Amino acid sequence: MKAVLIAGPTASGKSALALALAEAAGGTVINTDSMQVYRDLRVLTARPTIEEEVCAPHRLYGHVDAAVNYSAGAWVNDAAAVLAEVHAEGRLPIFIGGTGLYFKALTRGLSDVPPVPDEVRQGVRARLDRDGPEALHEELARRDPQAAARLKPRDRVRIARALEVVEATGRPLADWHAHGLPPLLPAEGVTALFLAPDRAALYERIDRRFEVMAASGALAEAEALGRRGLDPLLPAMKAHGVPALIRHLAGELTREEAIAIGQIDTRHYAKRQFTWFRHQLPEFEWIAPNDARAWLGAKLGMTLP
């Protein structure tokens, strides 16, 4: 089963590389980024443009509403269906994105944690708001010591998630992780690379891109999200730039302050992406962006434009 996996930090040039490969090899570009699934965030997540999407088939982009707490498990299910369709069409699947957990699920499998009922999630979130993360971390230490030992006492999101699972299922996260979903792609036939640009140049590009976003629709996206009154803990509401821009629109930050926060958050995220892939998926080949087309062409026996 042939497939190409293109990972890398945000703003590293993944989309252009994937599109060039899709056009040259008859491929379908499959989103492997947890934020680009949201239809409400085309600008702020730097999704491919409509013009780019016309050049080659693109799947799993913008198919989820911001009100949905979309999970890695949901993505795996969606990706499995898309992968079957792409192979039936005789096209090359090209998975592209920066979400390490999605790539890990592709090649190594994923824990099969069942959905948490809304009433359980809402109850845990209410206690989190009322009592604070430290109190819930103490509760987690009693109910799932292994998870509590792994999490910092102020890690609101992960503490809440671990408590939701043990409360809904009666079993700790580790039990579910031990019995998971098999990988979608076997190791053989998979070409996997991580675009690794120079850090300083990448950070400059991130800063410039966020300024362009702010002038090209990002504020309108943030305003539309803010008007919906969604839970601020939803993934879409935590996308880089969204909280700061909403605060700016509410008069709490200047435009310059909001942009600076968005830039800093995005640079920090890029740094975490380097670290995560280095330790979690060492089988990915690290390639400089300027060398990526030649490297891919040699691997696949073709010339990329």
Swiss-Prot record:
Enzyme Commission number(s) from the entry: 2.5.1.75
Annotated residues for binding of substrate: 10-15
Required cofactor(s): Mg(2+)
Keyword terms: ATP-binding, Magnesium, Nucleotide-binding, Transferase, tRNA processing
Pfam family, one: IPPT
Nucleotide-binding listed as a keyword: yes
Residue numbers spanned by region Interaction with substrate tRNA: 33-36
A GO term for molecular function: ATP binding
Catalytic activity of the protein: adenosine(37) in tRNA + dimethylallyl diphosphate = N(6)-dimethylallyladenosine(37) in tRNA + diphosphate
InterPro entries registered for this protein in UniProt: Dimethylallyltransferase, IPT, P-loop_NTPase
Enzyme class: transferase
GO biological process terms held by the UniProt record: tRNA modification
Annotated site residue numbers, Interaction with substrate tRNA: 99, 121
Statement: the UniProt record of this protein carries the keyword ATP-binding: yes
Binding residues for ATP: 8-15
Matches recorded under HAMAP family: IPP_trans (MF_00185)
Subunit structure: Monomer.
Function, in words: Catalyzes the transfer of a dimethylallyl group onto the adenine at position 37 in tRNAs that read codons beginning with uridine, leading to the formation of N6-(dimethylallyl)adenosine (i(6)A).
UniProt record similarity statement: Belongs to the IPP transferase family.
Protein name (database record): tRNA dimethylallyltransferase
Organism of derivation: Afipia carboxidovorans (strain ATCC 49405 / DSM 1227 / KCTC 32145 / OM5)
